[in-house]
């Protein structure tokens, strides 16, 4: 690129993007300035400056750049999505949420990234139901759908403290494409909570009525499954001990 003849906008943009990739911020700033010297209305230069500001974690500068780009291209959602991210990272979560909502509801191409942004913002604010609703926006045809299901499962497991919530979380970890070790860990957590809740009438979990003994059996199985999958010797020993502690013993 340094040997390219002239300094056309295309060459300068390519130089700027290459500088961004290699964290060469001064070179990027030079490319941006040359672009703006040639054309003060070159929105691509301002966009590039916004990307650089994000990389430098200068979120107010990123917001200013992306807001300026949106002002020049009011019908485009890309600068609005970028502005939402800059606001999110800069702590302006209310504005970020509003921008993500607009992106998610305006163009199908932006639903997935906007939905994940909404989920992050709402999770940060402690709005678990709102975060789950955002993740549910991700279409089944999207490449991000499996990730959305994993995120839903993780949030449901973390929040599950009563019988209906534990039941819903168990269904979610079955439906999501999770690694076996993650399924085992989540199952352990959920059956530990279920064991504390189950009474004489049993407990309804994922479409089944389980007795206290059956819950203990499921918990023991989760301990042993997780023990078989972990590479950590100390953790494996603790899990096996926990499984043995709840196994029903009989004298022959």
Named regions from a protein language model:
Residues 10, 44, 78, 112-113, ...:
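Start-of-helix register in tetratricopeptide repeats
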Residues 14, 48, 82, 117, ...:
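"A position-specific structural signal for the A-helix of alpha-solenoid helical repeats
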Residues 22, 56, 90, 125, ...:
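Structural motif corresponding to the intra-repeat A-B loop/turn of tetratricopeptide repeats
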Residues 38, 72, 106-107, 140-141, ...:
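Structural marker of alpha-solenoid helical repeat scaffolds
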Residues 1-3, 130, 136-252:
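Eukaryotic alpha-helical solenoid repeat scaffolds
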Residues 1-15:
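Regulatory extensions appended to serine/threonine kinase catalytic cores
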């Amino acid at each position: 690129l340094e040997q390219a003849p002239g300094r056309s906008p295309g060459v300068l943009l390519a130089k700027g993007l290459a500088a961004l990739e290699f964290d060469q911020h001064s070179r990027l700033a030079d490319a941006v300035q040359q672009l703006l010297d040639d054309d003060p209305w070159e929105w691509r230069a301002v966009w590039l400056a916004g990307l650089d500001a994000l990389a430098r974690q200068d979120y107010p500068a990123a917001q200013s750049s992306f807001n300026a780009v949106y002002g020049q291209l009011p019908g485009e959602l890309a600068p609005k999505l970028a502005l939402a991210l800059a606001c999110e990272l800069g702590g302006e979560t209310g504005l970020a949420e509003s921008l993500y909502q607009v992106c998610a509801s305006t163009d199908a191409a932006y639903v997935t990234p906007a939905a994940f942004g909404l989920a992050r913002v709402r999770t940060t604010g402690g709005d678990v139901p709102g975060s789950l609703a955002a993740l549910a926006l991700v279409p089944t045809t999207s490449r991000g759908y499996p990730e959305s299901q994993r995120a839903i499962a993780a949030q449901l497991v973390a929040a599950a403290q009563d019988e209906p919530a534990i039941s819903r979380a168990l269904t979610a970890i079955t439906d999501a494409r999770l690694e076996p070790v993650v399924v085992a860990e989540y199952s352990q957590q959920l059956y530990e909570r279920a064991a504390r809740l189950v009474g004489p009438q049993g407990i309804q979990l994922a479409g089944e009525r389980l007795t206290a003994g059956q819950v203990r059996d499921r918990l023991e199985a989760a301990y042993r499954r997780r023990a078989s999958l972990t590479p950590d010797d100390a953790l494996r020993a603790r899990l096996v001990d926990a499984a043995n502690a709840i196994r029903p013993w009989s004298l022959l």
